[in-house]
Amino acid sequence: MLLAEELALIAIDPDSGRHAIGTRDKLNACLAGLLVVEAQFDERPDVPIIDAAREVLDDAGPKLKSVLSAMNRGLVRRLGSGTWDAVVQGLVAAEIVAPADGTVRPRHRVLETAQRDEIIDRLRAAAASDDPLPVNTAVLLSMTGPAQLLELVAPERAARKHARRRIDHALDATALEPVSQSVRKVLADAAAAVAVASSVAAIGAVTSG
């Protein structure tokens, strides 16, 4: 399973068949970061989403922020689906989740709950420890924070401060640290843009009144 697929799988709530409301943009940024990692280091041939991510990387690079921002549109052009849907389609093809049920907000029933549980258990152990982490686990853990999955990784409130520190520093002093930093920067810039737009709208409403 690709790292991006692992993140998407744990983000799907088995009860609802969907990710949490309001997290799609955050998940897209994190999935884009994982696809960049896999495009650079995964040597498996003929994986369509990785091949498409490599093309986006070639077209939009070398600045990681530009690549991350371009990933969703780039995958739509190449695969016909945006980042989240393209990654989930890989889970559907592997029969890990069921095809979308066709509702307005599509749901994907998790078929391989044991695989989902194994990923969560691995991340919880990583977040709770201070031991060095395998690269794949460190990369995936680093994305659970910006993907708003902290409570999944650290269900006990008392453990969340330590887990947050592990998440935020999982890739420190590694070759993949720039990916983690760029994902967070893209999301911070997006949040700042929303805040500015809201302020402008509020000022406009006051002055027009």
Residue ranges and their predicted role:
Residues 72-82, 94-110, 114, 172-185:
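Acidic, Ser/Thr/Pro-enriched low-complexity segments and adjacent helix/loop capping patches
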